[in-house]
Amino acid sequence: MNVLVIGRGGREHALAWKFAQSEQVEKVYVAPGNEGMRDVATPVAIDENDFDALVLFAKENNIGLTFVGPEIPLMNGIVDRFEAEGLRVFGPNKAAAVIEGSKAFTKELMKKYDIPTAAYETFTNYEEAVAYIRKIGAPIVIKADGLAAGKGVTVAMTLEEALQAVKEMLQDVKFGEASKKVVIEEFLDGQEFSLMAFVNGTTVYPMVIAQDHKRAFDGDKGPNTGGMGAYSPVPQIPESAVEVAIETVLHPTAQAMIKEGRSFTGILYAGLILTNEGPKVIEFNARFGDPETEVVLPRLDNDLVDVCNSVLDGEKLVLKWSEEAVIGVVLASKGYPEVYEKGAIIGGLDTLEDAIVFHAGTAMKRGDFVTNGGRVLFVACKAKDLQEAKDKVYKEIAKIKSDGLFYRNDIGYRAIAKVDC
C-alpha cells in the first residue's frame, strides 16, 4: 500500500515516520513535504491546497490512504473532494472541520450541549468589545474567530494588553477575515493539557495526553507561538481528570456534532485546562496538534495504518501505548513568532545519535540544510521517565550548530517539578 500525507511541517514528518514503520506500507509520499523528510518519505511538489493535482497524484500513484495534516485544506473541503473521487482519506469533512474554523461556532456548540468551557461573548463591533473588556477587566482572553496559525489568541493580563489586542483584531484586521469577529472569554486558571482522539461519529478512541509550551521563551515568557515543545505523559494531570474530560468533553462533542448534522471522522483535538471545577475546553482542533503529535506518535505501539482503517471502517480498536516518556523541543528561527530571517545553515544533524528529528521549516541549499520557516526542527527523545528524556534531548540539541536558531531550555519543567515533589 502507498500512503500520502498532506502537509509540510513537523507534524507531517512525524506522521510519515509512523506510517513508514508499517509493514503494510510500500511507499510514503508527503505533499508538499520538505527535504528533511526524505529519510522516511518522498516529498511531492504539490501544494496542500491544490486539490486537483492532489487527487490526480493519488489516482496515478495507487494511493491506498491519504492522511490530511493541516487545518486549511480540511476547512476548504479536501476530504469531501477525495471522497467524491472514490479515494480513501482520513480527516473530517468541511462541515465537521468548522469546529476548528470558527471559534464562535464552537463556543455556541458547547453552550448548547453543556460542554464545560469558559464564559464568553462574541463581537464584531470594536466599541462594544472595548466596553465589554472595560466592564469585565483583566485578566481576560481575546481570540480571533477564524484561523490564525495558532497566533490569534491573546491572554491579556492587563487592561492595556486586552485593549491593544482587540484593536489589532477588529480595527486593524491583523488576521484578515479571521479577526473580523472576536470571542472574548473569561480567564481560566490551571494546568493546560492536550487530549486528542481518533473519532468516527460517536465512536471515540482517546490518545495519551500531552502538554505543549506555547510561549516563546523560558519560564513561559514572551509571545504566544504555535508551540515551542511538548511532552507526554503529563503526571501533574490526574488520570481521573482525563477520564472526566473524555466523558464530559470528547463523547458529548462527538454526539453534538452528529446532532448538528456535522458528523466528525478524523482527529479531534481538545485543548483543555484543569480548573478547580474540573476540565474545561480552551479550544478544539480538527486535526493532530503540532507539536503534540511529535511526542504522542512515538508512544503509539499500534500500526498507524491499522488504526486509520479501523476508525474509517467502524471496526473495534484497542490503542496500545508505551509506558516510556517523550520530550521534544522546537528549534525556531531567531525572531519567531514575529519577523525572522531564512537561509541560516544548520550543521551537526548527522551527529545526533539517540534522538528523533522531525523537520518543520528546513530547505536544502548546496548540500546543507538551511532554515526556511518559523519553527524549523523538532528534536525528541524517548526514555524511561521525563527527567531522563529531558537530559537526553538537550544533550542531543547541543550538537546542532546554527546561528539562526533558538529554543527553550525548560520544556517539561512543570511535570518534572511535580515528580520531584
Residue ranges and their predicted role:
Residues 1-94:
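ATP-binding N-terminal substructure of ATP-dependent carboxylate-amine bond-forming enzymes
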Residues 4-5, 100-181, 235, 240-251:
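Active-site nucleotide/adenylate-binding loops and adjacent lid/helix of ATP-dependent enzymes
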Residues 21, 36-38, 90, 112-114, ...:
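Solvent-exposed alpha-helices and their adjacent loops that cap or buttress functional pockets
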Residues 38-40, 53-56, 98-104, 217-219:
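Short, charged, surface-exposed secondary-structure boundary motifs
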Residues 156-291:
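Internal nucleotide-binding/catalytic subdomain
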Residues 246-268, 285-354:
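Active-site "cap" helix and flanking loop/linker of ATP-utilizing ligase/carboxylase catalytic domains
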Residues 309-421:
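Peripheral (often C-terminal) accessory segments that flank ATP-dependent C-N-forming ligase machineries
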